């Protein structure tokens, strides 16, 4: 037996190397350097949302009840945006508005900026987590690239849009019914459904759902029968080394259905990645345009003709009138601080009123 005497040739690890070893260690839930951003931000964003929807009123910012404590349910509770008078203030707890008073900070809408900013950085941390893990196991980074779509939509809707308007007040509040109100607002004040970027977004998301359904059904239909099990998967073995389904059979089937079909898996799966991510990015670009109050597809000639000819009406002119109704009814309720009062004769009336 040989005994080595003397100092180890290994250099002592520095702080960075020690942290790197601990953060990137193989464990049940990977932490990583991205976790230093993801986990605290996700914790604070979710904690702020649960706190706000449970306890905090929107009486001082919107004149509304918005918490479980006030009688709201899961669909009507929300963390509401700050008052319009606070413009684009970050509403820091220690800032000049709240001056360290937590109750006052909640009343002013401080939880909304808290949730929005921590939520944005939490999403970015999640994307970085996918980059980091992909690099660790030597994968391509397409998962992270795909997740840039939801991040772009979140940042454009919750941060860039209100930055282009007069304040955070015009961003969506964090709640189900609150988001519905925001959608109605977008339609009435921006004619959003006729915006080509919205159209591309809808085509991307619904097209992706269609592709996902077709792809899943096709794979199920062409699974190799490799056992005597009774269910769809037969005796499918999760560790089998051979191919699970027949691409050749799938190609023949869709060639007969449509006349064209994907001939290789790489192009097929890239297309399934490209369609929804591009749709989400187009929507985000469109919302940035709305932040600047850009308009799209105003068919003025139809509006003029409809105004001159009582018998001429299109679905477009009908929608324009509906948008005017949304604005007239919504503005006074939605922006109580403006003290808007519309004469009775200008408010649109349905047949039942």
Curated annotation (Swiss-Prot):
Subunit note: PSII is composed of 1 copy each of membrane proteins PsbA, PsbB, PsbC, PsbD, PsbE, PsbF, PsbH, PsbI, PsbJ, PsbK, PsbL, PsbM, PsbT, PsbX, PsbY, PsbZ, Psb30/Ycf12, at least 3 peripheral proteins of the oxygen-evolving complex and a large number of cofactors. It forms dimeric complexes.
Compartments in which it is found: Plastid, Chloroplast thylakoid membrane
Gene Ontology terms: biological process: photosynthetic electron transport in photosystem II
Binding site for pheophytin a: 130, 143
Binding site for a plastoquinone: 215, 262
Additional detail: 2 of the reaction center chlorophylls (ChlD1 and ChlD2) are entirely coordinated by water.
Protein residues bound to chlorophyll a ChlzD2: 118
Enzyme class: oxidoreductase
Keywords for this protein: Acetylation, Chlorophyll, Chloroplast, Chromophore, Electron transport, Iron, Magnesium, Membrane, Metal-binding, Oxidoreductase, Phosphoprotein, Photosynthesis, Photosystem II, Plastid, Thylakoid, Transmembrane, Transmembrane helix, Transport
Organism encoding this protein: Anthoceros angustus
Residue numbers binding chlorophyll a PD2: 198
Catalytic activity: 2 a plastoquinone + 4 hnu + 2 H2O = 2 a plastoquinol + O2
Listed transmembrane segments: 41-61, 125-141, 153-166, 208-228, 279-295
InterPro entries attached to this UniProt entry: D1/D2, Photo_II_D1/D2_sf, Photo_RC_L/M, Photo_RC_L/M_CS, PSII_PsbD/D2
Residues given in the record as Fe cation binding sites: 215, 269
Example of a GO cellular component annotation carried by this entry: photosystem II
EC numbers for this chain: 1.10.3.9
Protein name as annotated: Photosystem II D2 protein
Top-rank taxon, per record: Eukaryota
Family to which this protein belongs: Belongs to the reaction center PufL/M/PsbA/D family.
Residues carrying N-acetylthreonine: 2
Record function comment: Photosystem II (PSII) is a light-driven water:plastoquinone oxidoreductase that uses light energy to abstract electrons from H(2)O, generating O(2) and a proton gradient subsequently used for ATP formation. It consists of a core antenna complex that captures photons, and an electron transfer chain that converts photonic excitation into a charge separation. The D1/D2 (PsbA/PsbD) reaction center heterodimer binds P680, the primary electron donor of PSII as well as several subsequent electron acceptors. D2 is needed for assembly of a stable PSII complex.
Entry's cofactor comment: The D1/D2 heterodimer binds P680, chlorophylls that are the primary electron donor of PSII, and subsequent electron acceptors. It shares a non-heme iron and each subunit binds pheophytin, quinone, additional chlorophylls, carotenoids and lipids. There is also a Cl(-1) ion associated with D1 and D2, which is required for oxygen evolution. The PSII complex binds additional chlorophylls, carotenoids and specific lipids.
Membrane topology, record value: Multi-pass membrane protein
Pfam family, one: Photo_RC
Gene giving rise to this polypeptide: psbD
Coiled-coil ranges (or none): none
Annotated positions of the Phosphothreonine modification: 2
